[in-house]
Amino acid sequence: MLIEIPNVFSKQEVNQLREQLDARTWIDGNQTSGMMASTRKRNQQLDKDDPVALQIGELIMARLLAHPLFVSAALPLQFYPPLFNRYQGGDTFGYHIDNAIRSTSDGMVRTDLSATLFLSELNAYEGGELVIQDTYGQQSIKLAAGSLVLYPSTSLHQVTPVTSGERTSAFMWLQSMVRDEGQRRLLFQLDQSIQTLTAQQAAEQELFNLTGVYHNLLRRWSEL
């Protein structure tokens, strides 16, 4: 399941974030790569311990945890804190699958879901599409600044070469309360239907019943 979430941050907010990020020292992006991915990757990143990156990462996580669509789709349990990368001058990241387990200061995170938050305007660069192969085929993603795409970490994906301009983004992984992607999809579809019926003021008893089904399935499938 691939979910696009527009306007997580406003254009003004993105500009403020970029002013802070652009002023930092950028390093070789292979510090987060596995052995195979490192041969396919050419970009720059901020150090994971950069204080500004950490501060903005906390802001991103807080914003996402307050976003109903993100929470409904991801059912987040634990984040691997956001990192920041930059592509320019032909930089690219060939096809790869993200590492299954990531280590944090608080322990280990199973990477169920990956997310990219775009921080460059669409007209600021050429190329740089995030191409994701999933059960529905190949999808090419290039979103407006401030928008985010969420997709299963099991997906084969790449960033195509940036032929001009500069593509800056935040990227992150998270462990979901529900490990199985198919179960998460069913819960998401059910939750979205409940929200739609609530807005349409559907019969109260039917909403109670559907909500009960949702929570009982979540109770059955979740791992905490």
From Swiss-Prot:
The keyword Oxidoreductase applies. The lineage of its organism: Bacteria, Pseudomonadati, Pseudomonadota, Gammaproteobacteria, Alteromonadales. It comes from the Bacteria. SMART domains: P4Hc (SM00702). InterPro entries: Oxoglu/Fe-dep_dioxygenase_dom (IPR005123), PKHD_C (IPR041097), PKHD_hydroxylase (IPR023550), Pro_4_hyd_alph (IPR006620), Pro_4_hyd_alph_FE2OG_OXY (IPR044862). Its EC number is 1.14.11.-. GO terms for biological process: DNA damage response; intracellular iron ion homeostasis. Keywords: Dioxygenase, Iron, Metal-binding, Oxidoreductase, Vitamin C. Binds 1 Fe(2+) ion per subunit. GO terms for molecular function: 2-oxoglutarate-dependent dioxygenase activity; iron ion binding; L-ascorbic acid binding. Fe cation binds at residues 96, 98, 157. Its cofactor is Fe(2+); L-ascorbate. Residues 78-176 form the Fe2OG dioxygenase domain. This is PKHD-type hydroxylase SO_3913. SUPFAM superfamilies: Clavaminate synthase-like. Pfam families: 2OG-FeII_Oxy_3, PKHD_C. 2-oxoglutarate binds at residue 167.
